[in-house]
């Protein structure tokens, strides 16, 4: 039997607000601001959830965890990711790899890269080498360049 291969792509954006850390890939990173959101505002995990859901045409994160539902107020996005990945597993698929890009001027993320990758690998129970995270800037252009927020994109390859 030929393997069933699916690709998913996701994106998320959150604006900065008052605070002293951001949560990215389940890791709290010190910063001069927090991220405005109904949940913990983890743009990395939200983009990854959308990529996984998109790979099997299962909707998007907002359909599964609406920001109008008080149950998800302040929710830990690792819990959301675990739920989404279980939907993938329940359909007989597994993650081959995830490639994530985070765009922001600040905070600088290089020293948190391994910890962020490991956090995702732990939630999904996959090998570290299946998770890639890259950080970039937008050369001071756009809302991320003006340090108004953070953007993350994720692409996944899953197979059955």
UniProtKB/Swiss-Prot annotation:
Cofactor(s) named in the record: a divalent metal cation
GO BP annotations, alphabetical order: isopentenyl diphosphate biosynthetic process, methylerythritol 4-phosphate pathway; terpenoid biosynthetic process
Function: Involved in the biosynthesis of isopentenyl diphosphate (IPP) and dimethylallyl diphosphate (DMAPP), two major building blocks of isoprenoid compounds. Catalyzes the conversion of 4-diphosphocytidyl-2-C-methyl-D-erythritol 2-phosphate (CDP-ME2P) to 2-C-methyl-D-erythritol 2,4-cyclodiphosphate (ME-CPP) with a corresponding release of cytidine 5-monophosphate (CMP).
GO MF annotations, alphabetized: 2-C-methyl-D-erythritol 2,4-cyclodiphosphate synthase activity; metal ion binding
Binding-site list for a divalent metal cation: 12, 14, 46
Binding residues annotated for 4-CDP-2-C-methyl-D-erythritol 2-phosphate, in chain numbering: 12-14, 38-39, 60-62, 65-69, 136-139, 143, 146
Site (Transition state stabilizer): 38, 137
Official protein name in the record: 2-C-methyl-D-erythritol 2,4-cyclodiphosphate synthase
InterPro entries: MECDP_synthase, MECDP_synthase_CS, MECDP_synthase_sf
Record note on cofactor: Binds 1 divalent metal cation per subunit.
Entries under HAMAP family matching the protein: IspF
Pathway: Isoprenoid biosynthesis; isopentenyl diphosphate biosynthesis via DXP pathway; isopentenyl diphosphate from 1-deoxy-D-xylulose 5-phosphate: step 4/6
Pfam families from the UniProt entry: YgbB (PF02542)
Matches recorded under NCBIfam families: ispF
Signal peptide range: none
Lineage: Bacteria, Pseudomonadati, Pseudomonadota, Gammaproteobacteria, Moraxellales
EC numbers on record: 4.6.1.12
Entry similarity comment: Belongs to the IspF family.
The protein's assembly and partners: Homotrimer.
Keywords: Isoprene biosynthesis, Lyase, Metal-binding
